[in-house]
Amino acid sequence: NEKDGLIPNTEWKKNALGQNWYLGETIITGIGQGYMQTTPIQLCLMNAQIANGGYKIYPKIILDDQKQDKYKDKYIKLYKDQKNIQLIQEAMFSSTNEVMGTSYRSRIEDPKYQFAGKTGTAQVKKITAEERELDLKTFEIPYEQRDHALYVAFGPFKHPRYSISIVIEHGGSGGTVAAPLAKKLFKMIIDRHEIRKNFDTNKYLNI
């Protein structure tokens, strides 16, 4: 029951709303605002395709042996210029691992666990000019009116294996509540991967 996402453009706005597209909408769409709509799974998929260098991924929950060859050898490159992907990867790394980054407090310095990510928020209501001038803290806003907190990340950074998308309903800031959770998850997931990798199956089967 996954809902369709939406990356708006001039054609969509003309057909859906009967209105012209403005330059300012191109700018805000580039940072995920405006009419853009995504689900957490779509965010996770996009993030994974950035991590793997820009190749299309066909997500699946359970591997069906009868269909496992369906996507074999379908290495579709989504971006013409590899430099654009590298720029995004480096920007996400900086956002997490460099001072002034929005999730810097959740960084892990050990390269084994080091990840790259980006914080975000999703508004649940239109904010008026008067409300914006009040400059309220998250805890001062009624719970049901607080932004949802978002965070997407991939890791380990040098050899990406995992993509994470986190949404905390009415959590406020992604850097405050979602990124710290990602830090815990990466530590746990990578440690468990090490255990599986070092597990000698034959040793235990021969007992």
PLM-predicted stretches and their roles:
Residues 1-165, 207:
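Beta-lactam-recognizing serine transpeptidase/beta-lactamase-like catalytic domain environment
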Residues 39-45, 177-184:
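Short amphipathic alpha-helical face segments that pack within enzyme cores
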Residues 67-77, 183-207:
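Short, gly/Ser/Thr-rich active-site loops of penicillin-recognizing serine hydrolases
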Residues 172-173:
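Short beta-strands and strand-coil junctions in structured, solvent-facing domains, enriched
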